[in-house]
Regions:
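Transmembrane alpha-helical insertion/packing segments
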Residues: 1-58
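Transmembrane alpha-helical segments of multi-pass membrane proteins
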Residues: 9, 14-25, 76-94
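Helical transmembrane-bundle signal
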Residues: 24-32, 57, 61-64, 84-91, ...
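Transmembrane helix-loop junctions in multipass membrane proteins, especially transporters and channels
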Residues: 36-43, 69-73, 99-104, 156-164
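Interfacial non-cytosolic loop connecting adjacent transmembrane helices
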Residues: 37-48, 94-138
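Membrane-interface starts of transmembrane alpha-helices
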Residues: 45-52, 56, 79-86, 131-143
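Canonical alpha-helical transmembrane segments
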Residues: 53-81
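Transmembrane alpha-helical segments in integral membrane proteins
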Residues: 60-71, 136-163
Length: 165
């Protein structure tokens, strides 16, 4: 059996990439599960803890994007860019369809089951901003998606430029 050896630098790089991906993702999942459970029991999602968790999620996602840029880690930025772009497109189509029930339209059912988790992680924050939760949720999703796309493109283009020098 062959042992896999990593240099210290390579181990640090892998650990940083894993941490930059796992930390915001775990905060997002925890917040979404709590918020969905909180709402399913009939409680008001604009109360303190759900809004606080939503703020924590947005801060963790933005901090993850900033740290990905600082440490030049492209994978977390690309991962979250793709996740939130898909979420933004799906949520925009869902809002444009005019349906008020996630499960009313068969086309969006599978996508919304998967992509509702990121949106629900900060939906109480959107609901606390205004009673029309669609617009703030779309804005938050768009900002997170575009910031990650920008970082991913910047890291990709700067990496190519350094390799061509």
């Amino acid at each position: 059996m062959q042992k896999i050896k990593f240099s210290r630098t390579e181990l640090k790089n892998r650990a940083a990439t894993a941490l930059l991906t796992a930390a915001p993702l775990s905060v997002m999942l925890l917040s979404a599960i709590y918020n969905l459970a909180f709402e399913s029991f009939g409680y008001d999602i604009t109360s303190g803890i759900p809004v606080l968790l939503s703020c924590l999620t947005v801060i963790a996602l933005i901090a993850g994007t900033v740290l990905a840029a600082v440490y030049k880690k492209r994978f977390p930025a690309v991962f979250f860019a793709l996740l939130f772009l898909m979420c933004f497109i799906c949520y925009a189509c869902f809002c444009a369809s005019g349906t008020t029930d996630i499960y009313a339209d068969g086309f969006f059912e599978a996508l919304m089951l998967i992509l509702s988790v990121p949106v629900w992680s900060y939906m109480p924050l959107a609901a606390a901003i205004t009673s029309q939760t669609a617009a703030p949720a779309m804005i938050i999703t768009g900002v997170i998606a575009l910031s990650n796309v920008g970082v991913a493109l910047w890291l990709t283009l700067s990496g190519r430029k350094e390799n061509n020098v």
